[in-house]
Amino acid sequence: DREKGLVAIKPSGVPYEGMEERHIVVVDLDGRVVSGTYRPSTDTATHLALYKAFPGIGGIVHTHSHWATIFAQAGLDLPAYGTTHADTFYGSVPCTRNMTREEIEGEYEANTGAVIIETFQERGLTADAIPAVLVADHGPFAWGRDAVEAVHHAVILEECARMAFHTRLLRPDKQPIDSFLLDRHYLRKHGRTATYGQG
């Protein structure tokens, strides 16, 4: 809830299978627990850094999904090889640089957020146009206007990573799609004059 400056996040160490609404922890943007009896996720500081840096974000998902994590572990961006990718991501989904020993041994989770933000700033990317990132040697984070959209983007990211992996097996020299095809597919859904859908 951006107006109230509050974030609802999963509790640390509680298995998803047994998780209920009562387990959810509410924190403020400084990480102080406002509601709940459980400790918040160990990744809370990463989430808070992203909420502060990217005002359009209303929900964040961090996974270790198989195919996207392969790209993260390889330290590779996820290129836009086709229109499935271009419908959601306006270009390659970036992979961050490797974190330094000092960053990892220091405030690791906050520094994970910082390296994501640094990646977007240095590459001139916006979190609205590329609603996901791959953290090198770690895994993907995806986001959206709310939690439902964040999950949706995480699912699409995983499918795009799976298709990209197999595309490279068939065509190791495959290049990303042409910019005009990327523009056409992304902008018809997300541009100022979007034509996709009924609204």
Residues of each region from the PLM?
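Glycine-rich flexible loops
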Residues: 1-199
